[in-house]
A protein has these predicted regions:
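Short hydrophobic "strand-cap" motifs at the C-terminus of beta-strands
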Residues: 148, 170
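Phosphate-binding beta-alpha-beta segment of Rossmann-like dinucleotide-binding domains, i.e.
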Residues: 114, 119-127
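Short, glycine/charged-rich "phosphate-handling" switch motifs in NTP-dependent
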Residues: 165
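Short acidic/polar capping segments at secondary-structure boundaries
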Residues: 117-118, 151-153
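Conserved N-terminal beta1-alpha1 strand-loop-helix module at the mouth
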Residues: 1-78, 82-111, 126-129, 136, ...
């Protein structure tokens, strides 16, 4: 990712382009390395006043005092995470259908990430979510819904005007030469 550029520079440039939330997802590094990486990313986010979310790991979320944690369907149950984190942290949840979305909202999730909307290179096992199903999820809950999965400049306009709070993109930003410009272009075609 980042086309050979420095990871932290990519994050900073993406924020300058308009990113409002950064989520750090690491599956294959040690806890110590994750912690150290998260500290650096948190510092960047803090400097720019954007939210910082950790994927899956409540321990890292608490240790670096991130703004929140994002939980998938096979991660810590939302209610247990809320019991541990109290109201000090945001909790996001992945939902691929109306039932999961309503359950996440009921259990105390602050937002929902829903997808994969398009094919994605960052998650091998991601099942595609149809646009009509995404619209139904958006309309079934009162909490914000963000679309995830394979979103880039070529398909972002398909997500306009369906009630999403925002979108999540990894490769649509980091695979581009200019992360700042990639974000600006995606947002221009979404808003």
């Amino acid at each position: 990712a980042c086309s050979g550029k420095d990871f932290y520079k990519c994050i900073e440039e993406s924020i300058k382009g308009g990113v409002k939330i950064v989520q750090l997802r690491e599956k294959n590094i040690s806890t110590k390395d994750f912690y150290e990486k998260a500290l650096k990313v948190k510092e960047i986010c803090k400097n720019y006043g954007v939210l910082f979310i950790i994927n899956d790991r409540l321990d890292i979320t608490q240790a670096v005092e991130a703004d929140g944690v994002h939980l998938g369907q096979s991660d810590m149950p939302i209610e247990k995470a809320r019991e541990i984190l109290k109201d000090k942290f945001l909790i996001g949840a992945t939902a691929r259908n109306i039932e999961e979305a309503k359950k996440a909202e009921l259990l105390g999730a602050d937002y929902i990430g829903s997808g994969a909307i398009f094919g994605t290179s960052t998650k091998d096992n991601a099942k595609k979510l149809e646009m009509e199903d995404l619209k139904k999820i958006v309309n079934s809950v009162k909490i914000p819904v963000f679309a995830i999965g394979g979103i880039n400049i070529n398909n972002i306009s398909l997500l306009k005007n369906i009630g999403l709070q925002g979108i999540c993109s990894v490769s649509g930003i980091l695979s581009e030469k200019d992360c700042k410009k990639a974000v600006e272009n995606i947002l221009k075609n979404f808003n």
